Design a protein with these regions (language model features):
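Charge-rich, low-complexity N-terminal segments
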Residues: 1-145
Length: 145
């Protein structure tokens, strides 16, 4: 059985090595939507794979909320740029990978699976979609991890 939960946050980033000059050289923001699809067996006692409140409260909400109104920075970006952002912004997330929708989907997938593993409920992340826009998203699946 599959269940899906939608989360939202607002964040800014620069996507180094992008084709678009706007994305490559300018801080810009998105209204991100993150869809998390979980796979598991229906518990006969509850009639659910996992209560949606528990999906939110198992740490996924806190993980994604840490990105809300933050500037997302690639750790390999220019050191002066990183220091300037840290100096002028209270909410900064430094990523190991270039902050593309694809990389965010992979990172979220791994982090969410780690949170779920702590619950010992045999629930797996089937896929994670990171929407940067209404028309564009990246999706990580089990074989991408």
């Amino acid at each position: 059985m599959l269940i899906r939960k939608l989360f939202k946050f607002e964040a800014a980033h620069i996507v180094r090595n992008a084709v678009s000059e706007r994305c490559k050289y300018s801080i810009h923001g998105h209204s991100y939507k993150v869809e998390v699809c979980l796979k598991g067996k229906v518990n006969p006692d509850t009639g659910m794979v996992m209560d949606f409140i528990e999906v939110k409260n198992c740490g996924i909400y806190n993980l994604l909320d840490s990105y809300d109104h933050a500037t997302i920075i690639w750790k390999n970006d220019d050191e002066e740029y990183i220091n300037d952002i840290k100096k002028h912004s209270k909410r900064v997330v430094i990523m190991d990978l270039n902050p593309t929708a694809e990389n965010m989907a992979i990172i979220f997938h791994k982090q969410i699976q780690s949170l779920l593993d702590k619950l010992n409920k045999n629930i797996k992340v089937k896929w994670v979609r990171v929407h940067e826009t209404d028309s564009g998203y990246a999706q990580s699946e089990e074989d991408d991890i």
